[in-house]
């Protein structure tokens, strides 16, 4: 089997060191809001309205696999068209007994997203940063971490996300789930997106007369 490897700079309190990681699995979490029961009620109601051919899943959080070859640390990459978008997410890397935390973008082909639950994730590269923190050094202030994401459309910055990750389930909750425990190390897990800034996005689109696809 072809090896997929990334080079990560580990920024520790003890200093910085380079770590080469052979990736054993790549996956993403969806519907990972910390209010697990509230999310479950909302998804059950959606399934009742729309039937089982819906975007809602039977469990939450739920997980999807991504081809390891799609993981990239390149600053630029090619996609199929303008309806490809990303979501800034915390990314956890598990390598044996060690956990490292970085950020990445869960890319998705929005054009086919309504038709298939997982295939849109396989349509584009998944970028990940080049620097990570040891989880043991940041877990005591985990809920204070904040993630911000924006995209540039026609030269204008459109804010997408700006939230503390306290809105998401604890990392230990995700790592303890059976689907995650069985993933091969070194495992890379996109931990789920914080909510989009829908009002700010709409205001930016209107102010700069951006194309409707921006939304």
Spans of model-derived segments:
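Catalytic-core "active-site belt" of small-molecule-metabolizing enzymes
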Residues: 1-187, 195-215
